[in-house]
Amino acid sequence: MEFYIKYFNRKYNLSYDILRLSNPYGVNNLSKSLSGIIPTYINNIVSDNEIKVYGNGDIVRDYVYVEDFIDLNLKLLTTQEKNNIMNVGSGKGTSISELIKKIESVVGRKARIEYLPKREFDVDKNVLKITKVRDIYGWEPKISLSEGIKRTFHWMKGLK
Protein backbone atom coordinates (compact mmCIF):
# COMPACT_ATOMS: atom_id res chain seq x y z
CA MET A 1 0.00 0.00 0.00
CA GLU A 2 2.77 2.44 0.91
CA PHE A 3 4.38 1.80 -2.46
CA TYR A 4 1.20 2.88 -4.26
CA ILE A 5 0.81 5.96 -2.12
CA LYS A 6 4.37 7.04 -2.91
CA TYR A 7 3.75 6.30 -6.59
CA PHE A 8 0.69 8.60 -6.67
CA ASN A 9 2.75 11.24 -4.90
CA ARG A 10 5.38 11.14 -7.63
CA LYS A 11 2.97 10.80 -10.54
CA TYR A 12 0.23 13.23 -9.46
CA ASN A 13 1.97 15.30 -6.79
CA LEU A 14 -0.51 14.15 -4.12
CA SER A 15 0.74 14.71 -0.61
CA TYR A 16 0.45 12.06 2.06
CA ASP A 17 1.19 11.11 5.63
CA ILE A 18 1.32 7.41 6.42
CA LEU A 19 0.76 6.47 10.04
CA ARG A 20 1.83 3.03 11.18
CA LEU A 21 -0.36 2.55 14.23
CA SER A 22 0.43 0.29 17.17
CA ASN A 23 -2.46 -1.22 19.18
CA PRO A 24 -5.15 1.43 19.58
CA TYR A 25 -7.74 1.22 22.35
CA GLY A 26 -10.19 3.46 24.11
CA VAL A 27 -13.72 4.74 24.35
CA ASN A 28 -16.32 4.76 21.59
CA ASN A 29 -15.36 1.49 19.98
CA LEU A 30 -18.83 0.87 18.63
CA SER A 31 -18.27 -2.51 17.03
CA LYS A 32 -20.70 -5.18 18.20
CA SER A 33 -17.86 -7.56 18.93
CA LEU A 34 -15.06 -6.46 21.17
CA SER A 35 -11.98 -5.77 19.13
CA GLY A 36 -8.59 -5.35 20.66
CA ILE A 37 -7.00 -6.96 23.65
CA ILE A 38 -7.79 -4.25 26.22
CA PRO A 39 -11.60 -4.14 25.88
CA THR A 40 -11.64 -7.94 25.52
CA TYR A 41 -9.65 -8.42 28.72
CA ILE A 42 -11.75 -5.85 30.58
CA ASN A 43 -14.93 -7.60 29.50
CA ASN A 44 -13.60 -11.05 30.41
CA ILE A 45 -12.43 -9.97 33.86
CA VAL A 46 -15.72 -8.17 34.62
CA SER A 47 -17.73 -11.17 33.35
CA ASP A 48 -15.48 -13.66 35.20
CA ASN A 49 -14.55 -15.34 31.92
CA GLU A 50 -11.12 -16.82 31.42
CA ILE A 51 -8.48 -14.83 29.60
CA LYS A 52 -6.46 -16.85 27.13
CA VAL A 53 -2.75 -16.07 27.28
CA TYR A 54 -0.46 -17.63 24.72
CA GLY A 55 2.90 -18.39 26.28
CA ASN A 56 3.78 -17.20 29.76
CA GLY A 57 2.57 -13.59 29.42
CA ASP A 58 5.93 -12.08 28.55
CA ILE A 59 4.98 -10.99 25.02
CA VAL A 60 5.38 -7.19 24.84
CA ARG A 61 3.20 -4.79 22.86
CA ASP A 62 2.79 -1.04 22.44
CA TYR A 63 -0.65 0.49 23.11
CA VAL A 64 -1.89 3.95 22.15
CA TYR A 65 -5.05 5.59 23.47
CA VAL A 66 -7.46 6.59 20.71
CA GLU A 67 -7.74 10.25 21.80
CA ASP A 68 -3.98 10.64 21.47
CA PHE A 69 -4.21 9.24 17.95
CA ILE A 70 -7.07 11.62 17.12
CA ASP A 71 -5.02 14.57 18.42
CA LEU A 72 -2.21 13.62 16.05
CA ASN A 73 -4.59 13.39 13.10
CA LEU A 74 -5.96 16.85 13.85
CA LYS A 75 -2.42 18.18 14.03
CA LEU A 76 -1.64 16.63 10.63
CA LEU A 77 -4.61 18.44 9.09
CA THR A 78 -3.30 21.82 10.16
CA THR A 79 0.36 21.55 9.21
CA GLN A 80 2.27 22.11 5.99
CA GLU A 81 4.67 19.23 6.70
CA LYS A 82 3.72 16.33 4.41
CA ASN A 83 4.97 13.14 2.79
CA ASN A 84 6.12 11.33 5.90
CA ILE A 85 5.84 7.75 7.06
CA MET A 86 5.70 7.54 10.84
CA ASN A 87 5.11 5.08 13.63
CA VAL A 88 2.37 6.03 16.07
CA GLY A 89 2.25 4.40 19.48
CA SER A 90 3.29 5.07 23.03
CA GLY A 91 6.88 4.06 22.38
CA LYS A 92 6.63 1.99 25.58
CA GLY A 93 6.35 -1.76 25.86
CA THR A 94 3.96 -3.56 28.17
CA SER A 95 3.92 -7.31 28.65
CA ILE A 96 0.63 -9.20 28.61
CA SER A 97 1.16 -10.02 32.31
CA GLU A 98 1.69 -6.33 33.15
CA LEU A 99 -1.38 -5.40 31.10
CA ILE A 100 -3.54 -7.89 32.98
CA LYS A 101 -2.31 -6.52 36.33
CA LYS A 102 -3.15 -2.96 35.26
CA ILE A 103 -6.65 -4.01 34.19
CA GLU A 104 -7.18 -5.99 37.41
CA SER A 105 -6.21 -2.89 39.38
CA VAL A 106 -8.75 -0.72 37.56
CA VAL A 107 -11.56 -3.29 37.54
CA GLY A 108 -10.94 -4.37 41.14
CA ARG A 109 -11.08 -8.05 40.32
CA LYS A 110 -8.57 -10.83 39.64
CA ALA A 111 -8.44 -12.36 36.18
CA ARG A 112 -8.90 -16.05 35.57
CA ILE A 113 -6.15 -16.94 33.14
CA GLU A 114 -5.78 -19.96 30.88
CA TYR A 115 -2.20 -20.30 29.70
CA LEU A 116 -1.91 -21.89 26.27
CA PRO A 117 1.18 -22.85 24.26
CA LYS A 118 2.92 -19.92 22.62
CA ARG A 119 1.91 -19.46 18.99
CA GLU A 120 4.71 -19.61 16.44
CA PHE A 121 3.64 -16.42 14.67
CA ASP A 122 3.62 -14.22 17.78
CA VAL A 123 6.51 -11.75 17.83
CA ASP A 124 8.09 -11.56 21.30
CA LYS A 125 8.32 -7.77 21.37
CA ASN A 126 6.73 -5.10 19.20
CA VAL A 127 7.29 -1.56 20.46
CA LEU A 128 7.20 1.29 17.97
CA LYS A 129 9.91 3.90 17.78
CA ILE A 130 8.02 7.22 17.71
CA THR A 131 11.01 9.54 17.39
CA LYS A 132 10.08 10.74 13.89
CA VAL A 133 6.53 11.80 14.74
CA ARG A 134 7.83 13.48 17.90
CA ASP A 135 10.59 15.33 16.03
CA ILE A 136 8.47 16.45 13.07
CA TYR A 137 5.15 17.22 14.76
CA GLY A 138 6.05 17.58 18.43
CA TRP A 139 3.51 14.84 19.17
CA GLU A 140 3.67 12.52 22.12
CA PRO A 141 0.88 10.51 23.67
CA LYS A 142 -0.60 12.23 26.73
CA ILE A 143 -2.76 9.46 28.18
CA SER A 144 -0.88 6.82 30.17
CA LEU A 145 -1.84 3.18 29.75
CA SER A 146 -3.27 3.05 33.29
CA GLU A 147 -5.37 6.18 32.71
CA GLY A 148 -6.51 4.93 29.30
CA ILE A 149 -7.58 1.59 30.77
CA LYS A 150 -9.51 3.46 33.48
CA ARG A 151 -11.32 5.63 30.90
CA THR A 152 -12.07 2.61 28.71
CA PHE A 153 -13.41 0.62 31.66
CA HIS A 154 -15.70 3.44 32.84
CA TRP A 155 -16.98 3.95 29.30
CA MET A 156 -17.68 0.22 28.90
CA LYS A 157 -19.40 0.16 32.31
CA GLY A 158 -21.73 2.92 31.13
CA LEU A 159 -22.86 0.80 28.16
CA LYS A 160 -24.26 -2.01 30.29
Over which residues does each language-model region extend?
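Non-catalytic, hydrophobic alpha-helical segments
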Residues: 69, 73, 88, 99, ...
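PAPS/PAP-binding and catalytic site of the sulfotransferase fold
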Residues: 95-107, 148-152
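Active-site loop of classical SDR/Rossmann-like NAD(P)-dependent oxidoreductases
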Residues: 96, 117-132, 143
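Amphipathic terminal alpha-helices
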Residues: 145-160
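Active-site Tyr-X1-5-Lys
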Residues: 1-17, 22, 45-47
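Glycine/proline-rich active-site loop of Rossmann-fold NAD(P)-dependent oxidoreductases
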Residues: 26-40, 49-50, 54-58, 66-67, ...
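Conserved active-site helix of classical SDR/Rossmann-fold NAD(P)-dependent CH-OH oxidoreductases
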Residues: 2-6, 10, 39-42, 71, ...
